[in-house]
Amino acid sequence: AISFVHFAPNYPNIEALAKLVSSDSLAEPSQLLIRLHPSHFQDKPKIFAEERARVFDLEKKYPHVHVVQPVALGGSLGYYGGEDMDEKSSMMAYSDVVVTVYSTMLVETAVHDTPMIAATIDTPGGWNKPKKFSLSLKEIGDWPTHKRFRDAKAGRVAENENELRDALNMYLKDKTVDAKERRKFIENEITVTDASSGKRTAEYILSVLKKANRKDR
């Protein structure tokens, strides 16, 4: 599925977070670690490069804001290769709260039992560019994965800065809020949750090889 960074600017969500962590609005002293979408590192279309530049300006403006800068893999491979998965996973595991737009990363975050917020702060008119399709972030909440996330009450949805502040403070004060719902969400999304998929995959491949060897005899 196409990423929502293509549908609408993500900057309002990021700016709201940067302002909150740099003010006295949050229950705990906080810092913001920003992970941009791979499309943000494209120079065409210009909208992604322009939004990337605005985000890096936030990093310069606010002392407690940091942007993850992946190393390009070279050629057409772009950014965020397989070796980046450990970093992404650790961000979800060790963050106090993960904030994203509606995203399948909510499923991955729930695996780590980390509180999560879907931020849908819109820019009026979207991209406001001729012939560039825009879709309000608030309109994608009924898409399959996102609707299941909302129905499970596995996290909170923030449609404006005040809702974002309140949800952040709730989780910063008590990380166990919605823990039961997060677990139920994962049980509904993922068939087996014993962290042994690698072992089972290897056992299956080995069983296929053994059957093939028996047929060859």
Predicted region positions:
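A nucleotide-sugar donor-handling region in carbohydrate enzymes
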Residues: 1-13, 42, 165-169, 173, ...
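Conserved catalytic-core segment of nucleotide-activated headgroup transferases in glycan assembly
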Residues: 1-76, 158
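Alpha-helical elements of Rossmann-like donor-binding domains used by nucleotide-donor carbohydrate transfer enzymes
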Residues: 16, 163-166, 200, 204
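A structural alpha-helix within SAM-dependent methyltransferase catalytic domains
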Residues: 18-22, 172, 202, 206
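Beta-sheet entry/capping signal
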Residues: 31-33, 96-98, 115-117
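Donor nucleotide-activated moiety binding/catalytic core segment of transferases
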Residues: 46-107, 111-112
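Catalytic binding pocket for nucleotide-activated donors in carbohydrate/polymer assembly enzymes
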Residues: 104-190
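C-terminal alpha-helical cap of glycosyltransferases
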Residues: 194-217
